[in-house]
């Protein structure tokens, strides 16, 4: 019984980080600003998203000027940034500007609420 409890505890500790974030990857842009992304289109494209499990977890995560790159390379894979997800920049009161590349073809509802 003790072994089973330890095994369950170990699995919980290992798997917990996998469900702790809503974003799939985080990458610094050329200006050193960390931008959070989710995979879209079967993992071939990216959408800008918020940090944390819920957009309210880290209000004001994005501040100042944010330049979204056209492409992002992570783990030797380059993917195009094609959208800005729901609530990606919501409640970022210190955000002064966002530069959006031509590769972005859709902006979700309430992305800039």
Where do the PLM segments sit?
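Hydrophobic h-region of N-terminal signal peptides that target proteins for export
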Residues: 12-21
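Consensus positions within tandem repeat domains that build extended binding/scaffold surfaces
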Residues: 85-88, 108-113
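Sec-dependent signal peptide recognition
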Residues: 5-11
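Short, Lys/Arg-enriched N-terminal segments with co-localized hydrophobic residues
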Residues: 1-3
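Non-globular, low-complexity intrinsically disordered regions
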Residues: 47-51
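Boundary at the C-terminal end of the N-terminal hydrophobic targeting segment
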Residues: 20-32
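Structural signature of tandem-repeat unit edges
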Residues: 41-43, 61-83, 93-106
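Short, ordered beta-strand-loop transition motifs
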Residues: 29-45
